[in-house]
Regions:
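Conserved short loop/turn motifs at secondary-structure junctions
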Residues: 219-223, 364-365, 446-448
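A structural motif corresponding to the C-terminal end of an alpha-helix
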Residues: 130, 378-387, 506-512
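Active-site diphosphate/adenylate-binding microenvironment
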Residues: 11-15, 22, 29-32, 37-39, ...
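Thiamine diphosphate
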Residues: 110-121, 265-268, 292, 309-311, ...
Length: 564
Protein backbone atom coordinates (compact mmCIF):
# COMPACT_ATOMS: atom_id res chain seq x y z
CA UNK A 1 0.00 0.00 0.00
CA UNK A 2 1.42 3.43 -0.99
CA UNK A 3 2.17 6.05 1.62
CA UNK A 4 -0.57 8.59 2.17
CA UNK A 5 0.15 11.90 0.42
CA UNK A 6 0.90 14.91 2.61
CA UNK A 7 -1.48 17.76 1.93
CA UNK A 8 -1.16 21.50 2.46
CA UNK A 9 -3.44 24.50 1.98
CA UNK A 10 -3.38 27.99 0.51
CA UNK A 11 -2.43 29.85 3.66
CA UNK A 12 0.55 27.53 4.24
CA UNK A 13 1.66 28.00 0.63
CA UNK A 14 1.57 31.81 0.78
CA UNK A 15 3.49 31.84 4.07
CA UNK A 16 6.14 29.53 2.62
CA UNK A 17 6.40 31.82 -0.41
CA UNK A 18 6.90 34.83 1.87
CA UNK A 19 9.62 32.98 3.78
CA UNK A 20 11.48 31.91 0.65
CA UNK A 21 11.51 35.53 -0.50
CA UNK A 22 13.07 36.70 2.77
CA UNK A 23 9.98 38.49 4.03
CA UNK A 24 10.51 38.61 7.79
CA UNK A 25 7.71 40.91 9.02
CA UNK A 26 3.97 41.30 8.44
CA UNK A 27 1.97 44.30 9.69
CA UNK A 28 -1.77 43.84 9.92
CA UNK A 29 -5.14 43.38 11.57
CA UNK A 30 -6.48 39.83 11.69
CA UNK A 31 -10.01 38.51 11.26
CA UNK A 32 -11.97 36.42 8.77
CA UNK A 33 -10.42 34.94 6.62
CA UNK A 34 -6.74 35.65 7.46
CA UNK A 35 -6.41 34.92 11.20
CA UNK A 36 -4.88 31.47 10.77
CA UNK A 37 -2.55 32.78 8.10
CA UNK A 38 -1.09 35.24 10.62
CA UNK A 39 -0.79 32.50 13.23
CA UNK A 40 1.04 30.23 10.81
CA UNK A 41 3.35 33.05 9.67
CA UNK A 42 4.33 33.65 13.27
CA UNK A 43 4.88 29.93 13.81
CA UNK A 44 7.21 29.92 10.81
CA UNK A 45 9.38 32.70 12.22
CA UNK A 46 7.85 35.68 10.42
CA UNK A 47 7.37 38.54 12.85
CA UNK A 48 3.72 39.60 13.03
CA UNK A 49 2.92 43.11 14.30
CA UNK A 50 -0.79 43.45 15.06
CA UNK A 51 -2.38 46.89 14.78
CA UNK A 52 -5.63 48.51 15.88
CA UNK A 53 -6.43 49.86 12.40
CA UNK A 54 -5.44 48.67 8.94
CA UNK A 55 -4.48 52.14 7.73
CA UNK A 56 -1.70 52.36 10.31
CA UNK A 57 -0.57 48.82 9.50
CA UNK A 58 -0.29 49.86 5.86
CA UNK A 59 1.69 52.96 6.74
CA UNK A 60 4.09 50.82 8.79
CA UNK A 61 4.57 48.48 5.84
CA UNK A 62 5.22 51.42 3.52
CA UNK A 63 7.76 52.94 5.90
CA UNK A 64 9.53 49.60 6.07
CA UNK A 65 9.65 49.49 2.28
CA UNK A 66 11.15 52.97 2.06
CA UNK A 67 13.86 52.13 4.59
CA UNK A 68 14.83 48.70 3.22
CA UNK A 69 14.07 48.71 -0.54
CA UNK A 70 12.07 45.52 0.12
CA UNK A 71 8.27 45.50 -0.05
CA UNK A 72 6.63 45.94 3.33
CA UNK A 73 3.73 43.53 3.83
CA UNK A 74 0.32 44.61 5.15
CA UNK A 75 -2.32 41.96 5.90
CA UNK A 76 -6.01 42.86 6.13
CA UNK A 77 -9.38 41.18 6.30
CA UNK A 78 -11.93 41.55 3.52
CA UNK A 79 -14.10 44.52 2.47
CA UNK A 80 -14.08 47.07 5.36
CA UNK A 81 -10.59 46.04 6.46
CA UNK A 82 -9.38 46.19 2.87
CA UNK A 83 -10.89 49.66 2.46
CA UNK A 84 -9.24 50.81 5.68
CA UNK A 85 -5.88 49.82 4.26
CA UNK A 86 -6.50 51.31 0.83
CA UNK A 87 -5.43 54.84 1.85
CA UNK A 88 -2.04 53.51 2.92
CA UNK A 89 -1.71 51.54 -0.32
CA UNK A 90 -2.48 54.64 -2.38
CA UNK A 91 -0.11 56.74 -0.29
CA UNK A 92 2.70 54.22 -0.86
CA UNK A 93 2.10 54.35 -4.61
CA UNK A 94 2.06 58.15 -4.75
CA UNK A 95 5.26 58.37 -2.69
CA UNK A 96 7.09 55.57 -4.49
CA UNK A 97 7.38 53.20 -1.50
CA UNK A 98 7.37 49.43 -2.15
CA UNK A 99 4.50 47.78 -0.31
CA UNK A 100 2.24 44.77 -0.82
CA UNK A 101 -1.23 44.74 0.73
CA UNK A 102 -2.54 41.19 1.04
CA UNK A 103 -6.25 40.99 1.78
CA UNK A 104 -8.62 38.12 2.28
CA UNK A 105 -11.79 38.36 0.23
CA UNK A 106 -15.11 36.65 -0.41
CA UNK A 107 -15.80 33.76 -2.77
CA UNK A 108 -15.62 35.05 -6.36
CA UNK A 109 -18.58 32.96 -7.54
CA UNK A 110 -20.84 34.73 -5.02
CA UNK A 111 -19.30 38.20 -5.37
CA UNK A 112 -19.57 38.26 -9.16
CA UNK A 113 -23.27 37.45 -9.00
CA UNK A 114 -23.75 39.98 -6.16
CA UNK A 115 -25.51 37.38 -4.04
CA UNK A 116 -24.62 39.01 -0.73
CA UNK A 117 -21.65 37.06 0.60
CA UNK A 118 -20.01 37.93 3.92
CA UNK A 119 -18.19 41.27 3.39
CA UNK A 120 -18.82 41.07 -0.33
CA UNK A 121 -16.79 43.49 -2.43
CA UNK A 122 -14.93 43.39 -5.74
CA UNK A 123 -11.70 44.34 -4.01
CA UNK A 124 -9.28 43.89 -6.90
CA UNK A 125 -11.05 46.36 -9.15
CA UNK A 126 -11.48 48.76 -6.25
CA UNK A 127 -7.72 48.69 -5.67
CA UNK A 128 -6.58 49.14 -9.27
CA UNK A 129 -6.71 52.96 -9.46
CA UNK A 130 -4.69 53.29 -6.25
CA UNK A 131 -1.99 50.67 -6.77
CA UNK A 132 0.84 50.11 -9.19
CA UNK A 133 -0.76 46.73 -9.91
CA UNK A 134 -3.49 44.49 -8.49
CA UNK A 135 -3.63 40.69 -8.71
CA UNK A 136 -6.24 38.12 -7.68
CA UNK A 137 -5.41 34.46 -7.05
CA UNK A 138 -8.10 31.96 -8.05
CA UNK A 139 -6.33 28.66 -7.35
CA UNK A 140 -3.72 27.69 -4.75
CA UNK A 141 -1.10 26.62 -7.29
CA UNK A 142 -0.88 30.26 -8.44
CA UNK A 143 -0.06 31.72 -5.01
CA UNK A 144 3.70 31.48 -5.53
CA UNK A 145 3.76 33.19 -8.91
CA UNK A 146 1.31 35.85 -7.70
CA UNK A 147 3.55 36.81 -4.80
CA UNK A 148 6.59 36.81 -7.08
CA UNK A 149 4.86 39.20 -9.47
CA UNK A 150 3.78 41.43 -6.59
CA UNK A 151 7.33 41.61 -5.23
CA UNK A 152 8.88 42.44 -8.60
CA UNK A 153 6.28 45.05 -9.51
CA UNK A 154 6.51 46.76 -6.12
CA UNK A 155 10.28 47.36 -6.26
CA UNK A 156 11.14 47.61 -9.97
CA UNK A 157 11.12 50.91 -11.82
CA UNK A 158 9.45 53.53 -9.66
CA UNK A 159 8.44 51.57 -6.53
CA UNK A 160 4.85 51.52 -5.37
CA UNK A 161 1.99 49.69 -3.75
CA UNK A 162 0.70 46.35 -5.06
CA UNK A 163 -2.56 44.69 -4.07
CA UNK A 164 -2.84 40.90 -3.74
CA UNK A 165 -6.37 39.51 -3.40
CA UNK A 166 -6.67 36.10 -1.70
CA UNK A 167 -10.25 34.75 -1.60
CA UNK A 168 -11.14 32.67 1.44
CA UNK A 169 -11.73 29.56 -0.64
CA UNK A 170 -8.20 29.81 -2.08
CA UNK A 171 -6.68 30.14 1.38
CA UNK A 172 -8.58 27.02 2.45
CA UNK A 173 -8.00 25.05 -0.76
CA UNK A 174 -5.75 22.01 -0.48
CA UNK A 175 -3.15 20.44 -2.74
CA UNK A 176 -0.39 17.88 -2.40
CA UNK A 177 2.48 19.39 -0.41
CA UNK A 178 5.38 18.34 -2.63
CA UNK A 179 3.60 19.70 -5.67
CA UNK A 180 2.81 22.94 -3.84
CA UNK A 181 6.49 23.51 -3.07
CA UNK A 182 7.31 23.37 -6.77
CA UNK A 183 4.93 26.29 -7.41
CA UNK A 184 6.79 28.71 -5.14
CA UNK A 185 8.97 31.25 -6.95
CA UNK A 186 12.00 32.86 -5.34
CA UNK A 187 12.42 36.22 -7.03
CA UNK A 188 15.94 36.86 -8.32
CA UNK A 189 17.21 40.42 -8.82
CA UNK A 190 13.74 41.96 -8.37
CA UNK A 191 14.91 45.48 -9.17
CA UNK A 192 17.60 45.32 -11.87
CA UNK A 193 19.69 48.41 -12.51
CA UNK A 194 18.33 50.75 -15.17
CA UNK A 195 21.31 52.43 -16.80
CA UNK A 196 20.91 55.96 -18.17
CA UNK A 197 21.72 56.93 -21.74
CA UNK A 198 25.44 57.91 -21.86
CA UNK A 199 24.64 60.91 -24.11
CA UNK A 200 22.23 62.25 -21.49
CA UNK A 201 24.88 61.94 -18.78
CA UNK A 202 27.41 63.80 -20.94
CA UNK A 203 24.87 66.53 -21.69
CA UNK A 204 24.04 66.91 -18.00
CA UNK A 205 27.67 67.38 -17.00
CA UNK A 206 28.22 69.81 -19.89
CA UNK A 207 25.25 71.96 -18.84
CA UNK A 208 26.30 71.99 -15.18
CA UNK A 209 29.85 72.94 -16.13
CA UNK A 210 28.58 76.01 -17.99
CA UNK A 211 26.23 77.10 -15.20
CA UNK A 212 26.97 80.20 -13.17
CA UNK A 213 24.42 79.45 -10.43
CA UNK A 214 23.79 75.68 -10.34
CA UNK A 215 21.65 73.97 -7.70
CA UNK A 216 20.97 70.32 -6.90
CA UNK A 217 17.59 69.38 -5.42
CA UNK A 218 17.51 66.04 -3.62
CA UNK A 219 14.14 64.29 -3.34
CA UNK A 220 12.99 61.25 -1.41
CA UNK A 221 13.71 59.19 -4.52
CA UNK A 222 17.37 60.01 -3.93
CA UNK A 223 17.01 58.94 -0.30
CA UNK A 224 15.32 55.69 -1.31
CA UNK A 225 18.09 54.90 -3.81
CA UNK A 226 20.70 54.63 -1.03
CA UNK A 227 23.21 56.28 -3.39
CA UNK A 228 24.47 58.34 -0.46
CA UNK A 229 28.20 58.03 -1.18
CA UNK A 230 27.85 58.85 -4.87
CA UNK A 231 25.72 61.92 -4.13
CA UNK A 232 28.15 63.20 -1.51
CA UNK A 233 31.14 62.67 -3.80
CA UNK A 234 29.46 64.48 -6.69
CA UNK A 235 28.32 67.46 -4.63
CA UNK A 236 31.62 67.88 -2.83
CA UNK A 237 33.65 67.44 -6.03
CA UNK A 238 31.67 70.05 -7.95
CA UNK A 239 30.88 72.30 -4.96
CA UNK A 240 27.30 72.66 -6.22
CA UNK A 241 24.95 73.85 -3.46
CA UNK A 242 22.16 71.40 -2.67
CA UNK A 243 18.63 71.70 -1.37
CA UNK A 244 17.07 68.61 0.25
CA UNK A 245 13.35 68.00 0.18
CA UNK A 246 12.05 66.98 3.58
CA UNK A 247 12.59 63.19 3.41
CA UNK A 248 15.96 63.71 1.69
CA UNK A 249 17.31 65.61 4.68
CA UNK A 250 20.37 63.83 6.02
CA UNK A 251 21.69 62.36 2.75
CA UNK A 252 24.27 65.01 3.43
CA UNK A 253 24.00 66.45 6.91
CA UNK A 254 21.87 69.59 7.14
CA UNK A 255 24.85 71.40 8.66
CA UNK A 256 26.95 70.77 5.53
CA UNK A 257 28.43 74.05 4.21
CA UNK A 258 26.93 73.44 0.75
CA UNK A 259 23.37 73.06 2.05
CA UNK A 260 21.20 75.85 0.65
CA UNK A 261 18.18 75.00 2.81
CA UNK A 262 18.43 78.20 4.86
CA UNK A 263 18.37 80.23 1.64
CA UNK A 264 15.75 78.13 -0.15
CA UNK A 265 13.63 80.90 -1.69
CA UNK A 266 16.64 82.85 -2.90
CA UNK A 267 18.28 79.73 -4.34
CA UNK A 268 15.17 78.67 -6.26
CA UNK A 269 14.59 82.16 -7.63
CA UNK A 270 18.17 82.68 -8.81
CA UNK A 271 19.53 79.30 -9.91
CA UNK A 272 20.22 79.15 -13.63
CA UNK A 273 20.64 75.34 -13.85
CA UNK A 274 18.84 72.98 -11.47
CA UNK A 275 19.49 69.25 -11.28
CA UNK A 276 16.56 67.34 -9.81
CA UNK A 277 17.67 64.05 -8.26
CA UNK A 278 14.71 61.83 -7.41
CA UNK A 279 12.60 64.96 -6.92
CA UNK A 280 9.45 65.92 -8.81
CA UNK A 281 8.42 69.39 -9.96
CA UNK A 282 5.06 69.03 -8.24
CA UNK A 283 3.20 71.30 -5.82
CA UNK A 284 6.00 70.99 -3.25
CA UNK A 285 8.22 72.94 -5.65
CA UNK A 286 5.44 75.20 -6.96
CA UNK A 287 5.42 73.14 -10.17
CA UNK A 288 8.66 74.91 -11.11
CA UNK A 289 6.73 78.14 -11.72
CA UNK A 290 5.95 80.66 -8.98
CA UNK A 291 9.15 81.70 -7.24
CA UNK A 292 11.34 80.30 -10.00
CA UNK A 293 13.23 82.15 -12.71
CA UNK A 294 11.55 81.90 -16.10
CA UNK A 295 14.79 80.91 -17.82
CA UNK A 296 15.94 78.21 -15.38
CA UNK A 297 17.20 75.11 -17.19
CA UNK A 298 16.47 71.74 -15.63
CA UNK A 299 18.29 68.43 -15.55
CA UNK A 300 16.11 65.64 -14.15
CA UNK A 301 17.37 62.30 -12.86
CA UNK A 302 14.39 60.00 -12.49
CA UNK A 303 13.61 56.34 -13.02
CA UNK A 304 10.18 57.14 -14.49
CA UNK A 305 10.30 58.64 -18.01
CA UNK A 306 6.70 59.87 -17.77
CA UNK A 307 7.81 62.27 -15.02
CA UNK A 308 9.91 64.27 -17.47
CA UNK A 309 8.40 67.57 -18.76
CA UNK A 310 5.46 67.23 -16.36
CA UNK A 311 5.45 70.95 -15.47
CA UNK A 312 8.50 72.65 -16.96
CA UNK A 313 10.55 71.69 -20.02
CA UNK A 314 13.47 69.50 -18.98
CA UNK A 315 16.63 70.44 -20.90
CA UNK A 316 18.41 67.19 -20.07
CA UNK A 317 16.42 64.14 -18.96
CA UNK A 318 18.56 61.41 -17.38
CA UNK A 319 16.29 58.38 -17.10
CA UNK A 320 17.58 55.52 -14.99
CA UNK A 321 17.93 54.45 -11.40
CA UNK A 322 19.58 57.09 -9.22
CA UNK A 323 22.57 54.98 -8.18
CA UNK A 324 23.49 54.07 -11.76
CA UNK A 325 22.86 57.61 -12.97
CA UNK A 326 25.09 59.13 -10.29
CA UNK A 327 27.79 56.56 -11.00
CA UNK A 328 27.67 57.62 -14.64
CA UNK A 329 27.78 61.30 -13.67
CA UNK A 330 30.88 60.70 -11.54
CA UNK A 331 32.61 58.85 -14.37
CA UNK A 332 31.82 61.66 -16.81
CA UNK A 333 32.96 64.25 -14.27
CA UNK A 334 36.47 62.77 -14.39
CA UNK A 335 36.56 63.63 -18.10
CA UNK A 336 35.02 67.09 -17.68
CA UNK A 337 35.89 68.49 -14.26
CA UNK A 338 34.52 71.81 -13.07
CA UNK A 339 33.88 73.74 -9.88
CA UNK A 340 30.89 75.93 -9.11
CA UNK A 341 31.75 79.67 -9.19
CA UNK A 342 32.70 80.93 -5.73
CA UNK A 343 30.58 84.07 -6.10
CA UNK A 344 27.38 81.95 -6.21
CA UNK A 345 28.32 80.05 -3.09
CA UNK A 346 29.28 83.27 -1.32
CA UNK A 347 26.00 85.04 -2.03
CA UNK A 348 24.06 81.97 -0.87
CA UNK A 349 26.06 81.98 2.35
CA UNK A 350 25.17 85.62 2.96
CA UNK A 351 21.47 84.85 2.63
CA UNK A 352 21.85 81.74 4.80
CA UNK A 353 23.48 83.77 7.57
CA UNK A 354 20.80 86.46 7.41
CA UNK A 355 17.99 83.92 7.62
CA UNK A 356 19.76 81.95 10.34
CA UNK A 357 19.98 85.08 12.47
CA UNK A 358 16.26 85.71 12.07
CA UNK A 359 15.52 82.11 13.01
CA UNK A 360 17.87 82.31 16.02
CA UNK A 361 15.89 85.24 17.40
CA UNK A 362 12.66 83.25 17.14
CA UNK A 363 14.16 80.13 18.68
CA UNK A 364 15.74 81.93 21.62
CA UNK A 365 12.67 83.95 22.64
CA UNK A 366 11.25 82.66 25.92
CA UNK A 367 7.46 82.68 26.04
CA UNK A 368 4.83 81.31 28.36
CA UNK A 369 2.95 79.36 27.13
CA UNK A 370 5.47 77.87 24.73
CA UNK A 371 5.24 78.47 21.00
CA UNK A 372 6.41 76.30 18.11
CA UNK A 373 9.81 77.94 17.85
CA UNK A 374 11.10 77.73 21.40
CA UNK A 375 9.60 74.27 21.91
CA UNK A 376 11.20 72.95 18.72
CA UNK A 377 14.47 74.60 19.71
CA UNK A 378 14.49 72.38 22.80
CA UNK A 379 13.72 69.32 20.68
CA UNK A 380 16.52 70.26 18.26
CA UNK A 381 19.01 70.49 21.14
CA UNK A 382 18.18 66.96 22.28
CA UNK A 383 18.16 65.39 18.81
CA UNK A 384 21.53 66.96 18.01
CA UNK A 385 22.91 64.70 20.74
CA UNK A 386 20.98 61.67 19.44
CA UNK A 387 21.73 61.61 15.73
CA UNK A 388 20.93 57.91 15.24
CA UNK A 389 17.24 58.28 16.09
CA UNK A 390 14.52 58.07 13.45
CA UNK A 391 12.30 61.15 13.29
CA UNK A 392 8.64 60.91 12.25
CA UNK A 393 6.84 64.21 11.76
CA UNK A 394 3.27 65.17 10.89
CA UNK A 395 0.92 68.07 11.40
CA UNK A 396 0.50 71.50 9.84
CA UNK A 397 2.53 74.03 11.83
CA UNK A 398 4.25 71.18 13.68
CA UNK A 399 5.42 69.67 10.39
CA UNK A 400 6.42 72.89 8.66
CA UNK A 401 8.35 74.36 11.56
CA UNK A 402 10.04 71.11 12.58
CA UNK A 403 11.23 70.55 9.01
CA UNK A 404 12.97 73.93 9.02
CA UNK A 405 14.31 73.85 12.58
CA UNK A 406 15.47 70.29 13.26
CA UNK A 407 18.64 69.24 11.49
CA UNK A 408 19.13 65.70 10.22
CA UNK A 409 22.56 64.13 10.08
CA UNK A 410 22.05 60.71 8.51
CA UNK A 411 20.08 59.49 5.47
CA UNK A 412 16.61 58.01 5.70
CA UNK A 413 16.18 59.07 9.30
CA UNK A 414 13.26 61.44 8.61
CA UNK A 415 9.79 60.22 7.60
CA UNK A 416 6.89 62.60 7.15
CA UNK A 417 3.64 63.34 5.33
CA UNK A 418 5.25 63.13 1.90
CA UNK A 419 3.76 63.96 -1.48
CA UNK A 420 0.12 64.03 -0.39
CA UNK A 421 0.75 65.80 2.91
CA UNK A 422 -1.47 63.14 4.45
CA UNK A 423 -2.29 63.17 8.16
CA UNK A 424 -2.36 59.93 10.12
CA UNK A 425 0.99 58.47 9.09
CA UNK A 426 2.58 59.18 12.47
CA UNK A 427 2.12 56.05 14.55
CA UNK A 428 2.31 53.66 11.60
CA UNK A 429 5.57 55.17 10.34
CA UNK A 430 6.96 55.24 13.89
CA UNK A 431 6.18 51.55 14.42
CA UNK A 432 7.51 50.60 10.99
CA UNK A 433 10.76 52.52 11.56
CA UNK A 434 11.22 51.05 15.03
CA UNK A 435 10.52 47.45 14.00
CA UNK A 436 12.69 47.71 10.89
CA UNK A 437 15.68 49.42 12.50
CA UNK A 438 15.52 48.47 16.18
CA UNK A 439 16.50 52.08 16.92
CA UNK A 440 14.70 54.69 19.02
CA UNK A 441 12.07 56.72 17.19
CA UNK A 442 10.83 60.21 18.03
CA UNK A 443 7.45 61.15 16.55
CA UNK A 444 6.77 64.90 16.57
CA UNK A 445 3.03 65.27 16.22
CA UNK A 446 0.49 68.01 16.01
CA UNK A 447 -2.41 67.28 18.36
CA UNK A 448 -4.83 67.02 15.44
CA UNK A 449 -2.49 64.75 13.46
CA UNK A 450 -1.96 62.47 16.45
CA UNK A 451 -5.69 61.86 16.68
CA UNK A 452 -5.80 60.07 13.33
CA UNK A 453 -3.79 57.11 14.61
CA UNK A 454 -3.50 57.70 18.35
CA UNK A 455 -4.85 54.32 19.46
CA UNK A 456 -1.73 52.72 18.01
CA UNK A 457 0.01 53.78 21.22
CA UNK A 458 -1.43 50.53 22.56
CA UNK A 459 0.41 48.72 19.76
CA UNK A 460 3.61 50.55 20.69
CA UNK A 461 3.20 49.57 24.34
CA UNK A 462 2.19 45.97 23.55
CA UNK A 463 5.42 45.41 21.64
CA UNK A 464 7.41 47.64 24.02
CA UNK A 465 8.86 49.67 21.16
CA UNK A 466 11.35 52.51 21.86
CA UNK A 467 9.05 55.23 20.53
CA UNK A 468 8.77 58.67 22.11
CA UNK A 469 5.76 60.69 20.94
CA UNK A 470 5.98 64.47 21.33
CA UNK A 471 2.52 66.04 20.94
CA UNK A 472 2.38 69.78 20.29
CA UNK A 473 -0.92 70.55 21.96
CA UNK A 474 -2.51 73.89 21.14
CA UNK A 475 -6.07 72.62 21.36
CA UNK A 476 -7.01 72.83 17.73
CA UNK A 477 -6.63 71.93 14.09
CA UNK A 478 -3.92 74.41 13.07
CA UNK A 479 -4.53 76.41 16.27
CA UNK A 480 -6.94 76.64 19.18
CA UNK A 481 -9.35 79.39 20.11
CA UNK A 482 -11.53 79.23 17.01
CA UNK A 483 -14.72 81.28 16.76
CA UNK A 484 -18.20 79.72 16.67
CA UNK A 485 -19.92 81.78 13.98
CA UNK A 486 -23.33 80.34 14.84
CA UNK A 487 -23.33 82.03 18.24
CA UNK A 488 -24.70 78.83 19.77
CA UNK A 489 -21.66 78.13 21.91
CA UNK A 490 -20.58 75.11 19.87
CA UNK A 491 -16.91 74.30 19.29
CA UNK A 492 -15.39 75.97 16.24
CA UNK A 493 -14.75 73.67 13.25
CA UNK A 494 -11.03 73.91 14.02
CA UNK A 495 -11.28 73.46 17.80
CA UNK A 496 -10.24 70.38 19.74
CA UNK A 497 -10.75 69.80 23.45
CA UNK A 498 -8.76 72.47 25.24
CA UNK A 499 -6.28 71.48 27.97
CA UNK A 500 -6.34 67.81 26.91
CA UNK A 501 -3.82 65.64 28.75
CA UNK A 502 -2.55 63.23 26.11
CA UNK A 503 0.16 62.04 28.47
CA UNK A 504 -2.53 60.43 30.65
CA UNK A 505 -3.27 57.95 27.86
CA UNK A 506 -0.12 56.12 28.87
CA UNK A 507 -1.65 55.29 32.26
CA UNK A 508 -4.00 52.93 30.44
CA UNK A 509 -1.25 51.08 28.57
CA UNK A 510 1.59 51.02 31.11
CA UNK A 511 3.74 53.47 29.17
CA UNK A 512 5.35 56.68 30.40
CA UNK A 513 3.72 60.10 30.18
CA UNK A 514 4.98 63.65 30.72
CA UNK A 515 3.14 66.96 30.73
CA UNK A 516 5.56 69.81 29.99
CA UNK A 517 5.14 73.57 29.98
CA UNK A 518 8.77 74.80 29.76
CA UNK A 519 11.73 74.14 27.50
CA UNK A 520 13.73 72.67 30.39
CA UNK A 521 10.95 70.20 31.15
CA UNK A 522 10.76 69.29 27.46
CA UNK A 523 14.50 68.67 27.16
CA UNK A 524 14.47 66.48 30.26
CA UNK A 525 11.42 64.46 29.19
CA UNK A 526 12.68 63.90 25.64
CA UNK A 527 16.17 62.91 26.76
CA UNK A 528 14.73 60.49 29.32
CA UNK A 529 12.29 59.01 26.81
CA UNK A 530 15.00 58.32 24.23
CA UNK A 531 17.48 56.89 26.73
CA UNK A 532 14.93 54.72 28.53
CA UNK A 533 13.73 53.10 25.27
CA UNK A 534 10.27 52.94 26.87
CA UNK A 535 7.03 53.90 25.09
CA UNK A 536 6.58 57.55 26.03
CA UNK A 537 4.16 60.41 25.35
CA UNK A 538 5.20 64.00 26.02
CA UNK A 539 2.28 66.43 26.07
CA UNK A 540 3.77 69.83 25.17
CA UNK A 541 1.42 72.66 26.13
CA UNK A 542 1.52 75.22 23.31
CA UNK A 543 -0.10 78.63 23.13
CA UNK A 544 -3.51 78.17 21.40
CA UNK A 545 -2.76 81.31 19.39
CA UNK A 546 0.48 79.86 18.02
CA UNK A 547 0.55 78.80 14.40
CA UNK A 548 -1.33 79.71 11.25
CA UNK A 549 -4.19 78.02 9.45
CA UNK A 550 -2.85 75.20 7.25
CA UNK A 551 0.72 76.03 8.30
CA UNK A 552 2.94 77.17 5.43
CA UNK A 553 0.36 76.30 2.76
CA UNK A 554 -2.43 78.63 3.89
CA UNK A 555 -2.58 79.97 0.32
CA UNK A 556 -3.97 76.61 -0.88
CA UNK A 557 -7.08 77.01 1.30
CA UNK A 558 -9.94 78.62 -0.70
CA UNK A 559 -11.60 81.54 1.07
CA UNK A 560 -15.29 82.26 0.99
CA UNK A 561 -16.22 85.42 -0.87
CA UNK A 562 -19.74 85.80 0.47
CA UNK A 563 -21.55 85.36 3.76
CA UNK A 564 -19.88 85.10 7.18
Amino acid sequence: MSDQLQMTDGMHIIVEALKQNNIDTIYGVVGIPVTDMARHAQAEGIRYIGFRHEQSAGYAAAASGFLTQKPGICLTVSAPGFLNGLTALANATVNGFPMIMISGSSDRAIVDLQQGDYEELDQMNAAKPYAKAAFRVNQPQDLGIALARAIRVSVSGRPGGVYLDLPANVLAATMEKDEALTTIVKVENPSPALLPCPKSVTSAISLLAKAERPLIILGKGAAYSQADEQLREFIESTQIPFLPMSMAKGILEDTHPLSAAAARSFALANADVVMLVGARLNWLLAHGKKGWAADTQFIQLDIEPQEIDSNRPIAVPVVGDIASSMQGMLAELKQNTFTTPLVWRDILNIHKQQNAQKMHEKLSTDTQPLNYFNALSAVRDVLRENQDIYLVNEGANTLDNARNIIDMYKPRRRLDCGTWGVMGIGMGYAIGASVTSGSPVVAIEGDSAFGFSGMEIETICRYNLPVTIVIFNNGGIYRGGGVDLSGAGAPSPTDLLHHARYDKLMDAFRGVGYNVTTTDELRHALTTGIQSRKPTIINVVIDPAAGTESGHITKLNPKQVAGN
